[in-house]
């Protein structure tokens, strides 16, 4: 990894993001992994999903169930290990919005604090953080106000972590694509476009 110790794994529903995040955590951390789960068992279907994920993880991994206050919980956990797998950021955003459902400004402030604490914890501890998160910004505009707030807040959270990440992977049909490796900048994009416009040949 680079000087950053954060890895972000993005993907849509059933894209393979959780599986890739888990496999990556095993390759990097082996048995020395703390799995941080943000899901809450609100119904039978979610309870089954949580149990399936639990059975799918290595028995040697420790599990911390933390729907809110993730960064603070990791920082203060006596069980902290060399690699932290957070699955998933999507549900952390959802939990924050549900707690502040009538005050989006408060939800934004809480989420900014959550992300800042996560980054600060990784920077000051000898650990690697793998974060699994959903990419929900490529579909239709949600009909409800809460849906739009969720999309916007998760998009901001993903961008914030990606800016601090050593690598960001986008899962496409189970295939991990290292988007940071093929990323461009505004300066490079403008330069390529000028060349294309002037020569008529794609850069």
Q: What are the roles of these predicted feature ranges?
A:
Residues 21, 53, 85, 134, ...:
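Residue-level signal for inorganic ion chemistry
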Residues 59-110:
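Helix-adjacent hinge/juxtasegments
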Residues 7-77:
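Conserved P-loop
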Residues 1-7:
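Phosphate-binding P-loop
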Residues 33, 84, 167-170:
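Short, well-ordered beta-strand core segments
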